[in-house]
């Protein structure tokens, strides 16, 4: 049995979020939460929030125990890019691309034995 949680349109670059999400893939949820709590990156806050949501979904919707859960799948997809303009000298304009991410975490029960 699996439980999942998705956060969409998070205003962080997918490349930066993938650096953090690679740290927790395949780990027990308690270990993953500890890693995220002490990782000094902006993405770790959002990923921890999604992981806690996935754990709550597993406990409340699927009657799984938190002790047996692990991060089965964790991935970051690219969301839409917001375009912003930055005025420059002599009437020119620079384009800022604000990248967004869709973060998905799937937790499952580890088979005992």
Curated annotation (Swiss-Prot):
One of its GO terms (biological process) is translation. It comes from the Bacteria. Keywords: Ribonucleoprotein, Ribosomal protein, RNA-binding, rRNA-binding. GO terms for cellular component: cytosolic large ribosomal subunit. InterPro entries: Ribosomal_uL22, Ribosomal_uL22_bac/chlpt-type, Ribosomal_uL22_bac/org-type, Ribosomal_uL22_CS, Ribosomal_uL22_sf. CDD domains: Ribosomal_L22. One of its GO terms (molecular function) is rRNA binding. Belongs to the universal ribosomal protein uL22 family. NCBIfam families: rplV_bact. This protein binds specifically to 23S rRNA; its binding is stimulated by other ribosomal proteins, e.g. L4, L17, and L20. It is important during the early stages of 50S assembly. It makes multiple contacts with different domains of the 23S rRNA in the assembled 50S subunit and ribosome. This is Large ribosomal subunit protein uL22. It comes from Carboxydothermus hydrogenoformans (strain ATCC BAA-161 / DSM 6008 / Z-2901).
């Amino acid at each position: 049995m699996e439980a999942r949680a998705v956060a969409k349109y998070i205003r962080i670059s997918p490349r930066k979020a993938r650096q953090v999400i690679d740290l927790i893939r395949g780990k027990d949820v308690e270990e993953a939460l500890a890693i995220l709590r002490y990782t000094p990156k902006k993405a770790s806050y959002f990923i921890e929030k999604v992981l806690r949501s996935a754990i709550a979904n597993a406990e409340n919707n699927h009657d799984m125990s938190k002790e047996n859960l692990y991060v089965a799948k964790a991935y970051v997809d690219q969301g839409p890019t917001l375009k912003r303009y930055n005025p420059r000298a002599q009437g020119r304009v620079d384009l800022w691309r604000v990248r967004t991410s869709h973060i998905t975490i799937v937790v499952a029960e580890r088979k005992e034995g």
